[in-house]
Amino acid sequence: MSQPIKENKIYFENLDFLRFIAFFTVFAGHTALGTFLINRIHVDVINKFIWVFSQGGTGVSFFFVLSGFLITYLLLIEKEKTGKINVRNFYVRRILRIWPLYYLVILFTFIIYPKVKVLLNNIDPIPNNIWMHLSFLSNFDIINTERKEMITGVKNIPVMIGVNWSIAIEEQFYLVWPLLFALIPKKFYKYIFIVIIFISAIFRYINRADSLVTYFHTLAVFSDLAIGGFFAYLSINSETFQQFFKQIKKYQIAIVYVLGLSILMYGNFIYPNKYDIAYMRIISTTFFAFIITEQNFSEHSIYKLGKIKFITQLGKYTYGLYLIHPIGIQAVAIVLYKILKLNETQTTTQLIYICSALIVSIIIGFISYTYYETPFLKLKNKFETK
């Protein structure tokens, strides 16, 4: 068996920048930043670029691929070093990383926020099922709730839990993934990825007419995680794959980036048929996996993103930023539009809203990471594989 690339390197220094960019696309989608810019820029190619990077779905899909890559890489390295996978320790590490902040946000959304709404003379009930969120099944709750919204025409899903569905899918992935590699013989590992990618594509094809299912359902997006995992597997087990990414030239990398971005920007023209949903996601997520692998292992990268220190530092707070930014956005909206009574349609007000929401989210994310998440992360380290 070939040796893994940079076997002792568990922290990938160039990925924190990408984490923040993925978060920012989600943030941009929730603040309508893309619409704000597109309405003021009348250059088609620029607007297409803005559209791609202001769609929350782009960032969420990238997060899935990144999680699949990192978790699979760590599991396979553990198997290489120790000859087994300690499933219990894996679960404990994931619980200590995900649950504390996740359940704090749930507490705020379902217990504290309703009282705030009453103070603001807004007594609309929260339509979501708290038990689905507590049990990490909120992606199915979102499907049901949005179906009701489509029938009634009333949109009242609290923005604070607008991202919980993706965390639920990640947790479902964490539950299943280590068991597969602990129980299935090593010689069959590559088939795990192939089978899951195939099943996910077939599921999307069968449900191609239902955009809610193809966007929120676990089976529809599991291929994202599997593709990230497959690239991690090949990074460790394929000498040919390793050498390709080590030796790929700058101009070749540039070509892939241009092609990948073009597909993302002009996908609606390239894939006009509704049947294309079955495989078009595989193409975009393979591009995301290429970016991750190229940044980690290429010796001729056009630029290593970890050199951009400020954004890289912000990337360390990404989990908190991702979960908390809806609260920051809502807080700023309440202050600007409910309390100060500013005009939502004015350009200056919209700029203040977007910039303030980002700053507030970063501040809350920093506080959360430093004073709330870090103690759990230190405890998590006790369950790392030695």
Task: For each feature predicted by the language model, list its residue ranges.
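Aromatic-anchored segments of alpha-helical transmembrane domains
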Residues: 24-31, 111, 196-206, 258-269, ...
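Alpha-helical transmembrane segments of multi-pass integral membrane proteins
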Residues: 111, 225, 230, 253-374
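Functionally critical transmembrane alpha-helices in membrane proteins and complexes, commonly lining
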Residues: 13-77, 99-101, 128, 137, ...
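Transmembrane alpha-helical segments and their boundary/interface "anchor" motifs
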Residues: 15, 57-60, 76-113, 123-133, ...
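Membrane-interfacial alpha-helical segments at the cytosolic side of multi-pass membrane proteins
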Residues: 25-30, 69-73, 110-111, 171-186, ...
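Short, Lys/Arg-rich, polar N-terminal cytosolic tail immediately upstream
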Residues: 1-11
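Interfacial loop-to-helix transition and helix-capping segments at the boundaries
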Residues: 10-13, 49-60, 124, 128, ...
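Solvent-exposed interhelical
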Residues: 171-198, 233-252, 345
